[in-house]
Curated annotation (Swiss-Prot):
Record's protein name: Polyketide biosynthesis protein ThaF
Keywords, ordered alphabetically: Acyltransferase, Antibiotic biosynthesis, Cytoplasm, Transferase
Location of the region described as Disordered in the Swiss-Prot/TrEMBL record: 627-689
Residues covered by region (Acyl transferase): 330-714
Compartments where found: Cytoplasm
Described function: Involved in production of the polyketide antibiotic thailandamide. Probably has an acyl transferase activity and could also have a flavin mononucleotide-dependent oxidoreductase activity.
Top enzyme class: transferase
SUPFAM superfamilies: FabD/lysophospholipase-like, FMN-linked oxidoreductases, Probable ACP-binding domain of malonyl-CoA ACP transacylase
GO molecular function, one term: [acyl-carrier-protein] S-malonyltransferase activity
Catalysed reaction equations from the record: holo-[ACP] + malonyl-CoA = malonyl-[ACP] + CoA
Gene designation: thaF
Organism: Burkholderia thailandensis (strain ATCC 700388 / DSM 13276 / CCUG 48851 / CIP 106301 / E264)
C-alpha cells in the first residue's frame, strides 16, 4: 500500500537509504530527475546535514517526488529480496507509485509529471490545505459551513474523514469544528488536493495528458481514485488522481474480493503507516497488517520481517523475481538477431565448447563451424542458415561470458531471433531444444514468398501508422520498432515498392528496401505461424529463471506465456524501443550485447541517448568482433520483427462480448450478436429503430434486491422535476450538433422515445432552420416535446424571431457568456399568468455552461435593464416583468465538461458538484419556488460514465459525440466509417475557426486526418506573421499545395464572396485581418468536406468529437453496435440508461455486502 500527501516527513527512509543499496539506488535515480528539473536535491532535503526532523516539509515541488521516490524505492527493495506483491493499492499520490510498480507508466516519466504538476499548481491555485477530522462524515453533511467552504475529500473509515479547500475558507471551517468540539488536525500540505482548491489546474492536466504513457497493469492495481480495481487505465485517469475524491473503503473491499481475506497480508510501504491504520479500522486483524517505515521505528528490521513473511508464501505462478543487483547498478544482456551475422563469427568459441558443437551439427545435419567461418555460397545470407548460426553463436558467447564472469544479469532480452538466445540464457529451454525451434523457424521463414520489407528512417511510429492509414497500402504492417525513428515495415512486395513515394512525401529522410523475400513479422506470416504453433506444442518450455523481455509486449514473460509469445512473435512486431525503455525504467544502467556485432549497441544510443550505450565489445569474448560490422549513419536495419496491423488494418483480435442488454423484444436475451464484417460500401438505410419499451421492461417497478433497497430503474434516474418540466419520461438529452448533424431524424427519434433532442442549427441558414422546425413538427403529430439549438452570435436575433413565429417553445442555449436581449425576449414571450394568479413559463431554456460566472447569469432573473427597456417599448407588460423578476432565466442548467467541439476542458467531477452547489445557493438566496435541475454533458459515452454522473448528482445527462456516429446523424457516411473506429485517445485540440484570432480551442477527430496539425500550424503562422506578404515562399507553397489546394488569392476571393461586407472592409485596411480571413477559410472548407464526405479531401476533415465516442466504441466492440449502421440514437440511449441503472444497483449491493 502506498500513501499520499500528508504522510511525509523529513528523514523518511533514512535508515534504508544508509543500509540498503537497492533503496539508495532508486532514490538517487529520482534525485537526479528532481535536480535536473528543479535544481533541488531530494537526498539533501531528506537526509542532508541541514535536514532536521520535525521541520516543516510541505513544499510540493519536493514532497511530490520525495513521496514517490521513497515508496517506490522501498517496493523495489522488497522485490530485490524476492517479495513480489499480489496486488498494489495506492491512495492519492500513492496511486502513481502503484501505477509505476504495475508498469502502467515508467517511473521516471511519472516523477517528471509530478514535478510539473506541482509547478502548475503553484502557478494556478490559491494556497490551501487539508484537514483530517476524527468523527463520522455526517458531521460534514450536517454542517452548512463545512459544505459551503470545503469539499469532502474522502471517508477512510466510520470515524475518520478528510476535507480540503482554500486556505481562507478552511480557517472558517476550523473555527466551526472547534466550536463543536470536533477533533481535527491539519495535514502538512500546501494545497487542498482533491477539492475545489486544485480545480484551476485541471485544464493544464488534461492538456498535457499525452505526456503520460499508459499500459494495462502487469500487477492487479487497486486505486483509491477509482474505488476499485483498475483494469484499463487511461492517461486521463492518471491526470485525475490529484483531483478526484478518495475512496479507500471501496478499494479495500475490492481487494478483499480478489482472494481469501484469511491469507491476505496488508503491507504499508508509506512513510507513516497511515493506510495500515485505516485498514485496521476496517477490520483487518493486526497479524495481517505490516508497516515498514515510520518516524520512530526500526525500518531496516521491519524490512527484514516483511521480506521473511513473503518468503514463506508461495510466489504466484509465472512471476519470477528480478535478481536486482544490490551493487552499484543493474545490468542486462542483449542478444542480436538477423542482420548481425558476419563471416568468421564464433571462431574463438567453437573449440571452447566442443560438446555443444557436436549437438548442433547433429541437429542441423551440417558443419556449423564451417558455415560460420567459411560462409560457402554465401549461405549466411539465407535465413534458414542464418538463424541457427546466430542462435548457436549467441548461446556460446553467453556461456563464455558466464564462465569468465560469474555475475548474473538482472534481465535478458533478444531482438527477434535473439529472443531464443535470451530464453536459453534464462533457462526456459535447453540448448538443443532452442536450436530445434530456431531451425524450424528459419525453414518456415525461408519458404515465405512474394513479400518484402523496408526500413523507414526519420519518422516515429505514430507518423508511420498515420501514413499507412491514409494511403491505399492496405497490406503493409509495422514489423520492427527498432528505434524511435527507425521503423521496419513489411507486406506484399509491390506495396513495399509503392510505399516509398508515400513515406518520402510524408517526410522520411531515407527509405531502404531490404534484400528479403518474405514479409517477416507481418500478417503474411500467419500460415508459417500456424505451422510453428503445431511444431512447438510438444516441447518442454519452462518459466524463465531470469526475467526475459518479450518482443511482442516489451514486458517480461510470465511463466506460462513463453510458448504463446514465440508463436505470436512470428507475425507480430518486435517492440525493441519499449524493451529498452522498460529495462532502463527498471534501473538497468549497463547493457552488454552478447554475440556478434554492435547493431543493438547502436540502436541503444538512439533509444537512450543519455546512456553511452552497451558495454559493447568488452562484453563479448570474441576479439575483433565489434569491428566486423561497420557502424553506419543511419545504422543498418536489424532483424525483422513481428508486426501487428496499423490502425487501418482490418483484422483485430476479438475481445470479450459486451454485456449490454438487447434493446428490442426480438433481440437475444444473452450476449449481443457478433458484429458483422465492415461493409465495403454504404448500405441502404436500416429500418427505423425498434421501440424502446422492451429495453426498459427488464427492471419492473417491483424489482428489489434482497430486501435491502429497490433496484435502480431507468425511470428513477435523474430528477423528476426536470422530466416533468420538459415533458419527458427519461432524464436523457441528445444535444444539438452544428450543421444539422443533430438532425430532424435524430430529434424525432428521441421525442418518440420519451427523451429530448435538440436540432443543431449552427452554420445553417434561417430558411434551413425553418424547414427543420416544420419537418420535426410534422413528424410529431402527438405533440411530443422537441427542442432547437440557439447559438449566441450574429444570427441570434433573427433566429429568435423565427422561433417565435414558428411556435418553438424549447431551446438549448449554447456558447453564451451572458444573457442577451434576444434570449430574454424568447423567455419573456412565454410568460403568462393563469386564472389562479400563478406565473406560467411556456418557453423552456436549457443553458449549457462550463464556467461558474455563466451559470450565475442563467440562474439569475433576466437583467433589470432588459426588463425596463422591454416594458418601455411595449414588448412586455408590467405583470410579465414582475413575474420575470421571480424566476431564473434558465429552466435547466447543463454543466459542460470536456466535450467535442468548443471546450474549456473542464472535468465533470470538479465542475458538476461546484455548479450544483452554486445553483442551489442562488436558488435559496432568491427564494425561487421551483428547483432548477442541473445536468451534465461531456465524456458520457458508456453506462459507467452515465452512472458516475448520476452519482455525482446530475439531474439529467446530455450526450453529443456518440450520437454523431448513428444512422440518424446528419454527418456523411465517410465520417461515420472513420468515427466507429476511434479509441479514447484519437481526438485532439485545434483552434476554433469562429474564434480563430482569440486562440479558442475545439476538440476534434485526430485519427486518419491532418486537420488538427494543420489548423494548429495556421494559428502559429498567424501569431508569427502580420500579413500574407510576410509569409516565406516555402510556407506559401506549402499552404497552397498541401493545405488549401488553390492559391491564396483564390482563397481570398472566396472569402470576399462568403464573409459579411464589414469584415471584408476591415480586412482591406488591416493586413493581419486579411491573413486571419484566409486562414479561417480553411476551417470552413474542412467542415464542408467532412459534411459532404468528400474522400479526395479526407485528410482535411474537421470533425468535432470528444473521447466519449472512443469509449462507446470500446464498450460495443464485437457486438452488433460496432457497426454504426446498427446504431440508432434512441436505442443507444436506452442501453446506456438501462446498464447504468443495473450498474448502480450492483454497486449498491457490493457496498452493503450483498
Amino acid at each position: 500500500m502506498f500513501s499520499g500527501q500528508g504522510s511525509q516527513y523529513v528523514g523518511m527512509g533514512r535508515a534504508l537509504y544508509e543500509s540498503e543499496p537497492t533503496f539508495r539506488h532508486h532514490v538517487d535515480r529520482f534525485d537526479e530527475v528532481t535536480r535536473d528539473k528543479t535544481g533541488t536535491s531530494l537526498v539533501a532535503r531528506l537526509y542532508g546535514r541541514d535536514a532536521r526532523a520535525g521541520e516543516p516539509f510541505d513544499d510540493t515541488h519536493v514532497t511530490h517526488p520525495a513521496l514517490f521516490a521513497v515508496q517506490y524505492a522501498l517496493a523495489r527493495t522488497l522485490q530485490a529480496r524476492g517479495a513480489q506483491p499480489d496486488i498494489v493499492l495506492g491512495s492519492s499520490l500513492g496511486d502513481f507509485v502503484a501505477a509505476a510498480l504495475a508498469q502502467v507508466a515508467p517511473a521516471q516519466e511519472i516523477v517528471a509529471w509530478l514535478i510539473d504538476q506541482a509547478a502548475s499548481m503553484a502557478r494556478a491555485c490559491e494556497p490551501g490545505f487539508m484537514l483530517a477530522v476524527l468523527g463520522p462524515a455526517s458531521i460534514y453533511r450536517g454542517s452548512d459551513t463545512l459544505r459551503e467552504f470545503s469539499d469532502l475529500v474522502g471517508v477512510n473509515y466510520a470515524e475518520h474523514f478528510v476535507i480540503g479547500g482554500n486556505r481562507a475558507d478552511l480557517v472558517r471551517v476550523e473555527a466551526a469544528l472547534a466550536r463543536e468540539g470536533v477533533v481535527f488536525h491539519r495535514l502538512p500540505v500546501r494545497f487542498g488536493f482533491h477539492s475545489r482548491n486544485v480545480a484551476p489546474v485541471v485544464p493544464w492536466l488534461h492538456a498535457r495528458e499525452a505526456n503520460l504513457s499508459c499500459r494495462a497493469p502487469t500487477i492487479p492495481w487497486a486505486s483509491c481514485t477509482a474505488g476499485g480495481i483498475v483494469e484499463a487505465p487511461t492517461a486521463r485517469f492518471l491526470t485525475r488522481i490529484a483531483i478526484d475524491p478518495l475512496r479507500f473503503q471501496e478499494a479495500a473491499r475490492a481487494i478483499e474480493q480478489t482472494g481469501s481475506p484469511d491469507t491476505l497480508h496488508w503491507v504499508d510501504l508509506g512513510p507513516s503507516g497511515t493506510l495500515a491504520n485505516f485498514a485496521r479500522r476496517l477490520g483487518v486483524p493486526n497479524d495481517r497488517l505490516h508497516v515498514v517505515m515510520g518516524p520512530f521505528g526500526d525500518d531496516a528490521r521491519a524490512l527484514g520481517r516483511v521480506s521473511n513473511l513473503h518468503a514463506s508464501n508461495a510466489r504466484p505462478a509465472g512471476a519470477p523475481a528480478a535478481p536486482v543487483s544490490e551493487g552499484v547498478s543493474m545490468h542486462a544482456f542483449l542478444f542480436p538477431g538477423q542482420g548481425s551475422q558476419v563471416k568468421g563469427m564464433g571462431a574463438a568459441l567453437f573449440a571452447r565448447f566442443p560438446d555443444r558443437m557436436r549437438l548442433a551439427n547433429e541437429i542441423l545435419g551440417y558443419d556449423l563451424a564451417a558455415l560460420c567461418i567459411e560462409n560457402p555460397d554465401n549461405r549466411l545470407g539465407q535465413t534458414q542458415f542464418t538463424q541457427p548460426a546466430m542462435y548457436v553463436v549467441n548461446a556460446l558467447a553467453y556461456l563464455a561470458r558466464r564462465e569468465d564472469d560469474a555475475g548474473a544479469p538482472a534481465f535478458v532480452a533478444g531482438h527477434s531471433l535473439g529472443e531464443y538466445s535470451a530464453l536459453f540464457a534464462a533457462g526456459a529451454f535447453s540448448f538443443e531444444d532452442g536450436l530445434r525451434l530456431v531451425k524450424k523457424r528459419g525453414e518456415l521463414m525461408s519458404a515465405a514468398r512474394d513479400g518484402g520489407m523496408a526500413a523507414v528512417l526519420g519518422l516515429d511510429e505514430a507518423r508511420v501508422a498515420e501514413i499507412l492509414a491514409l494511403s491505399d497500402l492496405r497490406g503493409i504492417d509495422i514489423a520492427n520498432l527498432n528505434a524511435p525513428t527507425q521503423i521496419v515495415i513489411a507486406g506484399p512486395a509491390d506495396e513495399i515498392r509503392r510505399a516509398q513515394q508515400w513515406f518520402e512525401q510524408g517526410g522520411c529522410y531515407a527509405y531502404v528496401v531490404l534484400p528479403v523475400s518474405g514479409a517477416f513479422h507481418s500478417r503474411m506470416m500467419r500460415d508459417a505461424q500456424r505451422e510453428f504453433e503445431r511444431f512447438i506444442a510438444p516441447f518442454d518450455i519452462g518459466a524463465p529463471g531470469i526475467p526475459v523481455i518479450a518482443n511482442v509486449t516489451g514486458r517480461p514473460y510470465r511463466g506460462d506465456e513463453v510458448r504463446r509469445g514465440l508463436v505470436e512473435q512470428i507475425a507480430s512486431p518486435v517492440r525493441w524501443v519499449d524493451t529498452i525503455r522498460y529495462l532502463s525504467e527498471q534501473g538497468v544502467e549497463r547493457f552488454a550485447e552478447i554475440g556478434t556485432g554492435t547493431v543493438l549497441t547502436d540502436l541503444l544510443r538512439k533509444i537512450l541517448p543519455q546512456k553511452a550505450g552497451a558495454s559493447g565489445a568488452a562484453a563479448r569474448p570474441q576479439a575483433g568482433a565489434a569491428s566486423a560490422v561497420a557502424a553506419s549513419a543511419p545504422p543498418r536495419p536489424t532483424g525483422m520483427a513481428d508486426a501487428q496491423p496499423p490502425a487501418a488494418s482490418p483484422a483485430r483480435a476479438a475481445t470479450a462480448a459486451s454485456t449490454m442488454p438487447p434493446a428490442s423484444a426480438s433481440a437475444s436475451a444473452s450476449a449481443p450478436a457478433p458484429a458483422p464484417a465492415p461493409a465495403p460500401a454504404p448500405a441502404p438505410a436500416p429500418a427505423p429503430a425498434p421501440a424502446l419499451a422492451p429495453a426498459f421492461a427488464r427492471a419492473p417497478a417491483s424489482t428489489s434486491t434482497n430486501g435491502i433497497a429497490p433496484a435502480a430503474r431507468v425511470e428513477q434516474l435523474g430528477c423528476p422535476e426536470f422530466k416533468r418540466r420538459f415533458g419527458l419520461k427519461y432524464a436523457y438529452v441528445a444535444g444539438g450538433m452544428v450543421h444539422g448533424i443533430a438532425s430532424v431524424r435524430m430529434v424525432v427519434a428521441m421525442a418518440k422515445a420519451g427523451m429530448k433532442g435538440y436540432f443543431g442549427t449552427g452554420g445553417l441558414s434561417l430558411d434551413a432552420i425553418r424547414d427543420a422546425v416544420r419537418a420535426i413538427r410534422g413528424a410529431l403529430p402527438a405533440g411530443e416535446p422537441y427542442g432547437m439549438n440557439l447559438l449566441s452570435g450574429r444570427l441570434e436575433e433573427a433566429t429568435v424571431d423565427l422561433y417565435l413565429r414558428e411556435g418553438v417553445t424549447s431551446v438549448e442555449a449554447a456558447a453564451y457568456m451572458h444573457v442577451t436581449p434576444a434570449l430574454a425576449r424568447f423567455k419573456l414571450a412565454g410568460l403568462s399568468v393563469d386564472r389562479d394568479g400563478a406565473t406560467v413559463s411556456a418557453h423552456k431554456i436549457l443553458a449549457k455552461v462550463s464556467r461558474p460566472e455563466v451559470a450565475t447569469a442563467f440562474m439569475s432573473p433576466i437583467p433589470e435593464k432588459f426588463l425596463e427597456r422591454f416594458v418601455r417599448d411595449g414588448v412586455i407588460s408590467d405583470a410579465q416583468a414582475r413575474a420575470a423578476r421571480a424566476m431564473p432565466v434558465a429552466d435547466a442548467v447543463c454543466v459542460e465538461a470536456d466535450s467535442g467541439g468548443h471546450t474549456d476542458m473542464g472535468a465533470m467531477p470538479a465542475l458538476l458538484p461546484a455548479i450544483r452547489r452554486l445553483c442551489a445557493d442562488i436558488a435559496g438566496e432568491r427564494g425561487y419556488r421551483d428547483k432548477v435541475p442541473v445536468g451534465v454533458a461531456g465524456g458520457i459515452g458508456t453506462p459507467e460514465a452515465a452512472a458516475a454522473a448520476f452519482v455525482l448528482g446530475a439531474d439529467f445527462i446530455l450526450t453529443g459525440s456518440i450520437n454523431q456516429c448513428t444512422v440518424e446523424s446528419g454527418i456523411s457516411d465517410v465520417v461515420k466509417d472513420m468515427l466507429q473506429q476511434i479509441n479514447v485517445h484519437d481526438t485532439d485540440y485545434a483552434p476554433a475557426g469562429d474564434m480563430f484570432e482569440l486562440g479558442a480551442k475545439v476538440q476534434v477527430l485526430r485519427r486518419g486526418v491532418f486537420f488538427p496539425a494543420r489548423a494548429n500550424r495556421l494559428y502559429e503562422l498567424y501569431k508569427q506573421y502580420d500579413s500574407v506578404d510576410d509569409l516565406p515562399d516555402a510556407v506559401r507553397r506549402q499552404l497552397e499545395d498541401k493545405y488549401f489546394g488553390k492559391s491564396l488569392a483564390e482563397v481570398y476571393a472566396d472569402c470576399e464572396r462568403y464573409y459579411p461586407a464589414d469584415e471584408i472592409e476591415r480586412a482591406r485596411g488591416n493586413p493581419k485581418q486579411k491573413l486571419a480571413l484566409i486562414f479561417r477559410w480553411y476551417f470552413g472548407f474542412a467542415t464542408r468536406a467532412a459534411l459532404a464526405g468528400n474522400e479526395a479531401d479526407k485528410v482535411n476533415f474537421q470533425v468535432q468529437c470528444g473521447p466519449a465516442l472512443g469509449a462507446f466504441n470500446q464498450w460495443v466492440r464485437n457486438t452488433a453496435l460496432e457497426n454504426w449502421r446498427n446504431r440508432h440514437v434512441a436505442e443507444m440511449a436506452a442501453r446506456i440508461l438501462q446498464d447504468a441503472a443495473d450498474l448502480l444497483s450492483r454497486r449498491y449491493l457490493s457496498m452493503v455486502g450483498r
